[in-house]
Each structure stands twice: as C-alpha cells, then as structure tokens.
C-alpha cells in the first residue's frame, strides 16, 4: 500500500468507523456465536501472496463483526464505560503514524515532555496536592501514563516493597532480604480489584484481605486493628491499597481514616481511582478524595470515564525516586547525555517500549475542555439517578447499594437464583448486556451508564426490557415452584407408602383375624412367631390346653410383645402333644396359614406396583424440569 492508496483507504476507514458508531444500535449488542467460531471462517495458514484490500474489509464485516461485543452500543450496560471519542481516535491515529518509541527523553523528547505536561494538567484538574506534580516548586513527585490500573497497582507495590526492604536492611544489615520479605504484609479490602491479589502474587508478598463495612467501605479502625495484631506476631505492614469507586458497586474506601493509620505505621498508601477518580474533575464530587494527602501514589483511568480510548491509565507518585529506584535498569545502549536534566519514563514502569499516548489525551482535553468533560460526567450521574428512580418505584425490585456516579446495583426481591436467571435470560436475548456482582452474599445486577451519548430514552428502554423479563422469569419460577412442590409431595407420598407397607406387613394378621385381636397381639413377623411359639397362632390349640380358662400376662424381653397365655401351663410330654394334635384339625390350621401367606404376597405385590408408579412419575417430572 503506497501513500496514494493509503489516502484513499484512510478516508474509507474513517467513513467505516463513523458509520459503525452512527448505526451501532442496529447490531446485536453481544455476539451470538460459540467459542471457536472464527477458525471455521478464517484460514489457519497465513496467505503467501498479497490480498485485495476490499476483500480484507469484507471479511471484517462478514467474519469479525459477528464476534464483536459492541461496548459503544446504547444497550451495553456492563462493567464500566470504555472511553471513546473522535478526538481520541484521531490522536491514536497520529501516534501510530508517528510511530515513535518514547522510552527516554532522547528517544523522543516531545513524547516525554507532552506526557509530563498533560499529567500535570490532569493532576490539577482532579485536585491532587502539588506534591504529586512534576513542575510544582520543591516537588519530588510526578505523573506517568501506564497501560492499565493493574500496572499502576503492581508498580506501586514493587516500589513499596523495595523501599521497605532498603529501610529494614539499614536496621538489620545481616538479615537476608528473603527473610525480611517473608514477614512483610500488604492489605486491601475484599472489594478491591482482583489485580491487587495478582500483584501480590507476582511480587511474592503476603496480602491480607480485610472486610469492609455494610456499605462496602474499608474503614481506618479495621485496618489499625489488623495491623496491630500483625505487628504483635512479628509481621511488618508495608503497603495498603484503597479504592475510590470499587468494581462491584462503586463504593469508596475511607482514606481520611486510613491515611493517618498508614502515616503512623510508615506504610505506603496507594489509592486506586480507576473509575471514580475521573469524577474528581467535578469539584462537587471530590468528597471521597478527603485524605488523599496521605497517599504515596494515586491512579485513575481516563480510558474509563474521560472519553479517551484504551490504553491510558494515569499514575502519580509523591516521591518519584522511590519509584525509579525499584525499577531502574540502565544498560549502556539506553544511556544519554541529558539523563540528569530530563525524565526517562522507562524507569517508571514495567515495559521499556512506550507509545505516544499523551497525544490522544491532549487531543481530548483540548477538544472538549474541562467544562465539556465535567458535563459528560454529570450527565452520566443524572442518568444513573433516573434509572435508580425506576427501580425504587417498582416494589418487586430493590436498590442493593448506595448509587454513586454512573453505576446502579439492583435486584429482584427474592432468591439469588431468581436474579441469576433474570440476568442470564436478558443477556441471552441480546437486548441488553449487564454483569453481576456479589454484595453481602446477595446476587445483584450492575447497571452502568456506558455510552458517551446515552439519553433518557436509552435508560427507559433498558428498564422496560428488564421489567418485561422480570415478569416472565417470575412466572416461570412460580411454575417451577409448583412443580417442585408436586415432586416433593410425590417423594413424601412415596416415603409414606413405604412406611405404610412396612406397617401393613407387620399388622397383617391383626386385620385378618379381628375376632382374635383382643386375645392375641401380633407385633412381630408371622413366620418368626410361628417358629418360636406355634401354638399361640391357633386359638384351638390354645383353648385345648389345660388351664386355658385362667390366663396370666406373658412376659418377654420386649414389654410391647404381650399375649394372653394359660396360667400354670403344665409341661406337655410327647403323648399329650400327640393327643392334642389328633384333636386339632390340622388341615384347617394350614389352610389358615396359606390364606395369610397369599394375602402377604398380594399386599407386597400391590405395594411394589405403587412404588414403581411413584418412581416413574418422579422420573417424568425430572425430565420435564430439565427440558
């Protein structure tokens, strides 16, 4: 592609991007595909010869776009906003066109110096103390653009670790660094971003995760108590990460309380304002910043809430030398003669190579102005309040946490399963896209205002979709509850039938021989009794025994096994027994036994059939429920 074709294709690309954003609402917000879809549409081997540009762009529309989640879509309300604006896109285009790698001042002076100036602009815009600014008098601090908030957290943790080890080595010069490191402890809230845990893993430091209060806010008293306990066990607190605008519900840790605790213990305090920090350009929203003067480092992401495309995460430190001492590696081929008078940003982060990211941020601030950016943030806050009012007007819904900035956490009144089904059904439909969070063990749904040009109509439409699906889900859940109750009743009836079958088997002779139930009690199995004492099962034998007219209570080891037997029954010799048997109609006795046996067999067969029918019914219900 030569410059002439680039001019042509570049204009076409600008048109494609503009048309994409103008008509994005005509697309489904989330892709309706399965993992691995693209390998069946794109060759698994690279082409050996050049391909026509028109064919490439046709594949973008036919093969790539069906697998794209459209973060700029008016129906996208998941996560946090993905910053995007035309000035930012043009800034990235120019940065890519220049193609410099600004790892040092000498590598590209403008790349370095514009970054320093723009970071000072933004530090002043959000109200940071002058200690964090590069060009403030007597300041040792400064700002830098990192790739993400995760990088900011990792870099600050590494700086705090290195500084703490240096201080401890002065006190204990003969103790190995590994021993000192094993005693060092970092802290964060349970609501902190997962990148804090990952950073601790990468830095090989212990991390204690603390419980926030009922509003998901980490308090100073909680931190101080845990630190005192750890110090009593010989551990060394060295780093605390706090969040202003948590991912789950946009809560704010109380740095006004936490800051003095960190100062007392000589601990590095990092403040992560990835989302919430952007709002501090509005003076009326700076309340949570109270106490920021205690921080050692601070970050926020214009690529979330300031119309700047990813990647663009801003980090400030109060003492830049503590940061660079932890990361400096200075081979000869990277040194230059101006290093004493300039900033080399390669010492401020993990990567050596750095893009000219300050350009897009410079373009955005100049194109919108501070007031334009403030109005954008205030509008998102207003739209979130509009959605909150919808939730509060509907009795079957509840707001799950205080609403801050552009995020509303809500749920249906009911079980976690009900809310999970609601969100799953909405997302599966492609009509909206939201994500969940867990607050106080409750499953909640996060609704975030994300689109740059979001309107009242967008908010109202989203609420209508949610209420429609909520009604359907509640109807389905009610039907499932009825079905589940029926299944439970079936199981209960099955258990009852089994119990009755057992009782029927035990009491079968009592039902058959009503005329003898007053004189004979059948508590045990017929066959056991017949073997152990056959005479009591034939009233004629009992009546023929001497002394049958007078009875006494027969006592066995089982007090419940009682029957009326003759008093003073004499010992029966063989001749007497033979005579008694001759007087007894044995045919009648065995006929009686046969009748009772047939009844037992029939009863058992009937019960078996009933149990099988119950089991078949359960299997049918379970199959229908799974479908």
Each language-model region and where it sits:
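N-terminal entrance/gating region of PLP-dependent enzymes' catalytic architecture
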Residues: 1-140, 345, 424-434, 442-443, ...
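Glycine- and acidic
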Residues: 3, 98-106, 132-144, 180-183, ...
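Conserved small-domain helix->loop->beta segment predominantly found in fold-type I
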Residues: 31-35, 340-379, 388-416, 431-441, ...
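Conserved PLP-enzyme active-site core in the AAT-like
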Residues: 139, 151-322
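Short, glycine-/Ser/Thr-/acidic-enriched flexible segments
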Residues: 191-193, 214-215, 245-247, 276, ...
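C-terminal, well-structured subdomains that either form a transmembrane helix-short loop-helix hairpin
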Residues: 242-254, 260, 294-299, 369, ...
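Active-site C-terminal subdomain of aminotransferase-like
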Residues: 265, 288-394, 402, 563
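PLP-dependent enzyme catalytic core of the Aspartate aminotransferase-like
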Residues: 439-627
């Amino acid at each position: 592609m030569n410059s002439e074709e680039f001019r042509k294709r570049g204009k076409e690309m600008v048109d494609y991007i503009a048309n994409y954003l103008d008509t994005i609402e005509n697309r489904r917000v989330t892709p309706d595909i399965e993992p691995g879809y693209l390998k069946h549409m794109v060759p698994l081997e690279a082409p050996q010869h050049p391909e026509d540009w028109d064919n490439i762009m046709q594949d973008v529309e036919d093969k790539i776009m069906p697998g794209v989640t459209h973060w700029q879509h008016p129906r996208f309300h998941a996560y946090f906003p993905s910053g995007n604006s035309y000035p930012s896109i043009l800034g990235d285009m120019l940065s890519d066109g220049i193609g410099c790698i600004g790892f040092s001042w000498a590598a590209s002076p403008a790349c370095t110096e514009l970054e320093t100036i723009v970071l000072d602009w933004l530090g002043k815009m959000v109200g940071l103390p002058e200690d964090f600014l590069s060009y403030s008098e007597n300041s040792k601090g400064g700002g830098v653009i990192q790739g993400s908030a995760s990088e900011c957290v990792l870099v600050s943790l590494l700086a705090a670790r290195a500084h703490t080890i240096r201080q401890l080595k002065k006190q204990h010069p003969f103790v190995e660094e590994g021993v000192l490191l094993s005693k060092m402890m970092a802290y964060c809230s349970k609501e902190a971003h997962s990148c804090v845990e990952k950073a601790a893993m990468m830095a090989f430091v212990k991390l204690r995760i603390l419980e926030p209060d009922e509003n998901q806010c980490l308090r100073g008293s909680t931190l101080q108590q845990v630190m005192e306990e750890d110090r009593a066990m010989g551990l060394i607190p060295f780093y605390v990460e706090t969040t202003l605008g948590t991912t789950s519900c946009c809560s704010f840790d109380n740095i006004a309380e936490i800051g003095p605790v960190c100062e007392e213990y000589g601990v590095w305090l990092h403040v992560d304002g990835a989302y919430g920090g952007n709002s501090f350009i509005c003076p009326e929203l700076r309340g949570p910043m109270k106490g920021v003067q205690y921080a050692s480092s601070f970050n926020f992401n214009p690529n979330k809430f300031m119309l700047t495309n990813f990647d663009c995460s801003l980090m400030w430190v109060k003492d830049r030398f503590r940061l660079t001492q932890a990361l400096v590696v200075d081979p000869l081929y990277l040194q230059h003669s101006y290093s004493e008078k300039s900033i080399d940003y390669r010492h401020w982060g993990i990567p050596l190579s750095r893009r000219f990211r300050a350009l897009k941020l410079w373009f955005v601030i100049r194109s919108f102005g501070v007031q334009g950016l403030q109005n954008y943030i205030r509008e998102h806050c207003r739209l979130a309040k509009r959605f909150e009012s919808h939730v509060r007007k509907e009795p079957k819904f509840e707001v799950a946490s205080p609403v801050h900035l552009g995020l509303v956490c809500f749920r249906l009144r009911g079980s976690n399963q009900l809310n999970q089904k609601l969100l799953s059904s909405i997302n599966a439909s492609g009509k909206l896209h939201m994500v969940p969070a867990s607050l106080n063990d409750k499953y909640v749904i996060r609704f975030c205002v994300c689109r740059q040009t979001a309107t009242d109509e967008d908010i109202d439409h989203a609420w209508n979709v949610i209420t429609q699906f909520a009604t359907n889900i509640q109807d389905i859940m009610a039907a499932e509850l009825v079905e589940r109750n029926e299944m439970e009743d079936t199981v209960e009836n099955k258990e009852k039938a089994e119990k009755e079958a057992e009782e029927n088997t035990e009491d079968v002779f009592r039902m058959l021989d009503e005329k003898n139930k007053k004189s004979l009690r059948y508590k045990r199995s017929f066959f056991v009794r017949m073997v152990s004492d056959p005479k009591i099962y034939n009233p004629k034998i009992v009546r023929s025994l001497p002394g049958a007219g007078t009875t006494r209570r027969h006592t066995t080891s089982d007090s419940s096994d009682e029957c009326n037997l003759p008093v003073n029954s004499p010992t029966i010799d063989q001749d007497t027994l033979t005579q008694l048997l001759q007087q007894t109609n044995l045919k009648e006795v065995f006929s009686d036994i046969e009748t009772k046996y047939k009844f037992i067999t029939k009863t058992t067969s009937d019960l078996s059939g009933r149990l099988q029918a119950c089991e078949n019914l359960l299997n049918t219900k379970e199959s229908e429920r799974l479908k």
